[in-house]
From Swiss-Prot:
Disulfide bonds: 15-31, 22-40, 26-42
Family: Belongs to the long (4 C-C) scorpion toxin superfamily. Sodium channel inhibitor family. Beta subfamily.
Name under which the protein is recorded: Beta-toxin Rc1
Biological process terms in GO annotation: defense response; envenomation resulting in negative regulation of voltage-gated sodium channel activity in another organism
Annotated GO MF terms: sodium channel inhibitor activity; toxin activity
Keyword tags: Disulfide bond, Ion channel impairing toxin, Neurotoxin, Secreted, Toxin, Voltage-gated sodium channel impairing toxin
């Protein structure tokens, strides 16, 4: 399933135009531009811990 991975506080994980960073916890991921900045978008989002 695709989506924005979140941290332990429920905040989207931000990135700085670095797809490798986004892919470390997902099947594949990339930096995606949002109104407020950049966040990781992932295919294969891991379940929340």
């Amino acid at each position: 399933k695709g989506g924005y991975p979140v941290d332990s506080k429920g905040c989207k994980i931000s990135c700085v135009i670095n797809n490798e960073y986004c892919s470390r916890d997902c099947t594949s991921g990339y930096c995606y531009f949002l109104r407020w900045g950049l966040a990781c978008w992932c295919d294969g989002v891991p379940p929340q811990r």
